[in-house]
Curated annotation (Swiss-Prot):
Quaternary assembly: Part of the 50S ribosomal subunit.
The family this protein is said to belong to: Belongs to the universal ribosomal protein uL15 family.
Organism per entry: Porphyromonas gingivalis (strain ATCC 33277 / DSM 20709 / CIP 103683 / JCM 12257 / NCTC 11834 / 2561)
Signal peptide: none
Gene Ontology CC terms: cytosolic large ribosomal subunit
Name of the protein described by the UniProt record: Large ribosomal subunit protein uL15
Disordered as annotated region, ranges: 1-51
Domain of life: Bacteria
Organism classification: Bacteria, Pseudomonadati, Bacteroidota, Bacteroidia, Bacteroidales
Length: 148
């Protein structure tokens, strides 16, 4: 057996419907489109969202919400990540540049430190925002917090 001798299983491949090729083919005449009406014509396509004259769902449902232009998006970083980063690179001070170098955040993202995990070493952590519990945990471990 080799690749050039492989064939699909018997009955696995069907020949396609050749429509509109005369009455002898069995698929001539209306060519599977039925008689008359917009759907039988060439170039037919119904509008996206058209429901046959019924009020479409996008008009039945009310508008709601808005996008707040003053929203500030923070990239969350957990204490467990800071701990592993400090152990791997033997750091006592962790800045946003260190997080960028480690590939954890992009250059123009704002960083918020969250309290998932524990910190055992005294770390000086620089970030744009801290959760209360994360700030308390860093200070309890003998470290300090610098808000940018």
């Amino acid at each position: 057996m080799n690749l050039s001798s492989l064939k699909p299983a018997e009955g696995a491949v069907k020949s396609r419907k050749r429509i509109g090729r005369g009455p002898g083919s069995g698929l001539g005449g209306t060519s599977t489109r039925g008689h008359k009406g917009a759907k039988s014509r060439s170039g037919y396509s119904k509008k996206i969202g058209f429901e046959g004259g019924q009020m479409p769902i996008q008009r039945r449902l009310p508008k709601f919400g808005f996008k707040n232009i003053n929203r500030v998006e923070y990239k969350p970083i957990n204490l467990s990540v800071l701990q592993t980063l400090s152990e791997a690179n033997s750091l006592s001070k962790i800045s946003v540049e260190d997080l960028i170098a480690a590939g954890l955040v992009s250059r123009n993202s704002l960083v918020k430190i969250l309290a998932n995990g524990t910190v055992t070493t005294a770390l000086t952590v620089e970030a744009h925002a801290f959760s209360k519990t994360a700030e308390e945990a860093i200070v309890r471990a003998g470290g300090s917090v610098v808000k940018l």
